[in-house]
């Protein structure tokens, strides 16, 4: 039956294709995996490239996906230690208010991160056996996440069309300089700037500083290393931005329920919340605990997949606060049980977050602001109390706060009373639930489901060998042509010459009139 279903999908879409995937770890992989599972269900052959140092991309997965593992000089433990070190530093050691220190910390992280992925990429593209196998496989499309550089180089080496699945790149630099998207700093907040769509003058100043930081540091320093590396591998001068700009389609994991209005291009599509789905029944014991809450309902608490534990002191403060709530609390927590854990709070190493948020008795969601969790809360219409830690989490919760669906607290400075008051407000003030439901209705009222949209455009690229007709001419222009500096210069030159000629003619006429007048006087 499954085979017949897959064959029917193949016939309806034209043909079954071969998809090569270059993934990113953590929540990025969870989103990518959702797309890949759907492609497999439609009969496509999906091959995922993973290094031997991969953290979450599991080669033992039995979902019908083929995994091609290549050896690398890094180890899984080293990669995990790298991410955990910087996660802890960016979460606990640096304040966003200290801009210069914050910039420097991100700069060091980006440089080390880039070095790690350059080494992994080198281990792949210089592996003749693996590359020969990939060439022979004749893939129809390369699906990649640009936050993990190398997919664009791989697509160029294999001469295959490239499709991106992306949440964001730092400062929107790739989207702007390679994808051609517009991000006017006057009204579009730069990602990681912690700003919303309505900015005061000083917030626009801050937004401009963030944009300049990413434009000049990230663009001028970090990418130049990849320019050299890609040129060496391809044997010809090329820029990394040029390779990124060859992406046929950008599947952006966002939507207007989270974003503020901004310009898009014909080859850019929002597919935010593609992993969201109707709630499924909970495990028996968990359902019993949820039902025991009565009319008060439950609160769901999760800080995502990357935060596995907290300090004992912080865990105890949180536990004592949660114990004061009349609601039952389901807390995703992997650490020592807090000494003052309330009877209303249950700890779990893993929770079916989507199913809990979709439960009829769920009242609020305590979240770190990761895009996956925020979209699940939007999907089910659940208001949030946000504790952002790093990256885009501050932005996501700033947007939700501006839209009236969340209260955001500072993880480092919040007191127990701040936390408790925020929870009581979100649960008891009906405006937060109303705003969350408004966003939920917006999310559901789309002409095509996000996952279906992602699948459609990947299959579209396979059917048509690309999507060149959607590519704006800006990609073929130099920077001075893009900004019409040559046209402005030409028009200024014409104006200058015309002005000069007019003045010259006027002076000649004036002199002739003057000379004629003098001659008449002499006569």
UniProtKB/Swiss-Prot annotation:
Keyword Membrane listed: yes
Cross-referenced SUPFAM superfamilies: UDP-Glycosyltransferase/glycogen phosphorylase (SSF53756)
Signal sequence segment: 1-16
Name of the protein described by the UniProt record: UDP-glucuronosyltransferase 2B16
PROSITE patterns listed in its UniProt record: UDPGT
UniProt xrefs under InterPro entries: UDP-glycosyltransferase, UDP_glucos_trans, UDP_glycos_trans_CS
Subcellular location(s) per record: Microsome membrane; Endoplasmic reticulum membrane
Modification sites for N6-succinyllysine: 129
Principal subcellular localization: membrane
């Amino acid at each position: 039956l499954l085979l017949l279903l897959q064959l029917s999908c193949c016939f309806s879409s034209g043909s079954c294709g071969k998809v090569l995937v270059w993934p990113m770890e953590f929540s990025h992989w969870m989103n990518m995996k959702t797309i890949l599972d759907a492609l497999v269900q439609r009969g496509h052959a999906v091959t995922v490239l993973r290094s031997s140092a991969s953290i979450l991309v599991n080669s033992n997965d039995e979902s019908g996906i083929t995994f091609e593992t290549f050896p690398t000089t890094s180890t899984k433990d080293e990669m995990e230690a790298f991410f955990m070190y910087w996660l802890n530093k960016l979460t606990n050691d640096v304040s966003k208010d200290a801009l210069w220190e914050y910039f420097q910390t991100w700069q060091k992280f980006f440089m080390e991160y880039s070095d790690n992925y350059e080494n992994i990429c080198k281990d792949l593209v210089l592996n003749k056996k693996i590359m020969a196998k990939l060439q022979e496989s004749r893939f129809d499309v390369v699906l990649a996440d640009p936050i993990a550089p190398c997919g664009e180089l791989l697509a160029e080496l294999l001469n295959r069309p490239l499709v991106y699945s992306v949440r964001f790149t730092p400062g929107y630099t790739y989207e702007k300089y390679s994808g051609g998207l517009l991000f006017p700093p006057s009204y579009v907040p730069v990602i990681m700037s912690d700003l919303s769509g309505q900015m005061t003058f000083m917030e626009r100043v801050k937004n401009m500083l963030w944009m300049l930081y990413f434009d000049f540091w990230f663009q001028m320093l970090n990418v130049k290393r990849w320019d050299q590396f890609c040129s060496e591998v391809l044997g010809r001068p090329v820029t990394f931005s040029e390779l990124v700009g060859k992406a046929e389609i950008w599947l952006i994991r966002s939507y207007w329920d989270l974003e503020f209005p901004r310009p898009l291009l014909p080859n850019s599509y929002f597919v935010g919340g593609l992993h969201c789905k109707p709630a499924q029944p909970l495990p028996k014991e968990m359902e019993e605990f949820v039902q025991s809450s009565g009319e008060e309902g439950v609160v769901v608490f999760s800080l995502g997949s990357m935060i596995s534990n907290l300090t004992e002191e912080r865990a105890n403060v949180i536990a004592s606060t949660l114990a004061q709530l009349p609601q039952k609390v389901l807390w995703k927590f992997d650490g020592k049980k807090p000494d003052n854990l309330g009877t209303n709070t249950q700890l779990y190493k893993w929770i079916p977050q989507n199913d809990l948020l979709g439960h009829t008795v769920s009242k609020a969601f305590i979240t770190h602001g990761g895009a996956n969790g925020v979209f699940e809360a939007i999907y089910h219409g659940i208001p949030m109390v946000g504790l952002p830690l790093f990256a885009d989490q501050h932005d996501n919760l700033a947007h939700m706060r501006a839209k009236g669906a969340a209260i955001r607290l500072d993880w480092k400075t919040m007191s127990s009373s701040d936390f408790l008051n925020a929870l009581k407000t979100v649960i008891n003030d009906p405006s937060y639930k109303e705003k969350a439901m408004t966003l939920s209705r917006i999310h559901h009222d789309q002409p095509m489901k996000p996952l279906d949209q992602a699948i459609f455009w990947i299959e579209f690229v396979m059917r048509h060998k690309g999507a060149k007709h959607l590519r704006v001419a800006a990609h073929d222009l130099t920077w001075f042509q893009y900004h019409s500096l040559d046209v402005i210069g030409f028009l200024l030159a014409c104006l200058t010459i015309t002005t000069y000629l007019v003045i010259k003619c006027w002076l000649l006429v004036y002199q002739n009139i003057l000379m004629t007048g003098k001659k008449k006087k002499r006569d």
